[in-house]
């Protein structure tokens, strides 16, 4: 007897990203949320907080997650709030004047490589003092308008949150990051597909997706190696 194996029940996995619809009148908020410039500019963080203070706290002060969480009705109501709209336009004008300034071409260009960057608690790609220092370097380079780019890694499980056990011992809680709700954007190739870079290592290649973090004027490229094609040892 010959038995044929059917693939009818084999799942066909596809990645789908669902985003909330931001009214055209509030698109400036979305653009600013995707640049970590807000992390060291209090006018911007205060603006996002005042959109909905309760939700702002619930999403951990993450502007991207905040805009995704707000209901359509809430967003429509904000378009009619003249105070919020004026504040948004004022902050956006400062933001655009800042990011559109051209770097001094007389100074050397800099490529900065680091394993971790402490830019904001929202983006957990750091673990200690080295990362915080590297993050400050990028922010200062942005404020000084240095022609710099950063290179690093994107981690699914970044820095942990701490809690205490009943006997007073520290517990490290590692939470998986939802990349779709972070101030990062995936880099696409010329065919509109996620860019993959191949890095030779020992006797095989490590494949990595590339994501971009806008740190004010400084672009930070981070690679992510957690691909299905890899053995577990190649995952970050």
Each model region followed by its residue ranges:
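Extended, charge-enriched "interface" segments that sit outside catalytic cores
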Residues: 2-101
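Structured, charged N-terminal subsegments at the starts of enzyme catalytic cores
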Residues: 104-121
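Glycine-rich, histidine-containing beta strand-loop boundary motifs that form or position
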Residues: 114, 150-154, 224
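Flexible loop/turn segments at secondary-structure boundaries
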Residues: 117-122, 155-161, 228
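A conserved hydrophobic secondary-structure block that centers on an alpha-helix together
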Residues: 120, 124-147, 151
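Hydrophobic or amphipathic alpha-helical targeting/insertion segments
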Residues: 142-160, 164, 171-174
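Extended, Lys/Arg-enriched charged tracts that mediate electrostatic binding to polyanionic substrates
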Residues: 167-211
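Conserved small/polar residues in nucleotide/adenosyl-binding loops
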Residues: 225-232
């Amino acid at each position: 007897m010959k038995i044929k194996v059917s693939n009818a029940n084999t799942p066909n996995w596809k990645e789908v990203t669902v985003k909330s619809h931001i009214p055209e009148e509030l698109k400036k908020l979305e653009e600013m949320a995707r640049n970590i410039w807000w992390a060291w500019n209090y006018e911007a963080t205060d603006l996002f907080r005042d959109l909905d203070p309760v939700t702002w706290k619930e999403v951990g002060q993450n502007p991207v997650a905040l805009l995704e969480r707000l209901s359509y009705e809430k967003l429509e109501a904000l378009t009619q709030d003249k105070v919020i709209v004026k504040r948004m336009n004022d902050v956006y004008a400062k933001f655009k004047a800042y990011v559109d300034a051209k770097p001094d071409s007389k100074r050397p260009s800099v490529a900065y490589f680091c394993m971790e960057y402490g830019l904001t608690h929202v983006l957990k790609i750091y673990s200690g003092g080295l990362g915080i220092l590297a993050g400050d370097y990028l922010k200062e380079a942005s404020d000084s308008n240095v022609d710099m780019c950063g290179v690093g890694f994107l981690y699914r499980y970044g820095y942990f949150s701490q809690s205490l056990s009943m006997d007073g011992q520290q517990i490290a809680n590692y939470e998986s990051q939802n990349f779709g709700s972070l101030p990062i954007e995936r880099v696409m190739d010329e065919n509109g597909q996620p860019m993959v870079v191949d890095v030779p290592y020992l006797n095989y290649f490590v494949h990595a997706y590339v994501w971009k973090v806008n740190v004010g004027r400084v672009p930070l490229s981070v690679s992510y190696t957690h691909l299905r094609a890899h053995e577990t040892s190649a995952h970050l």
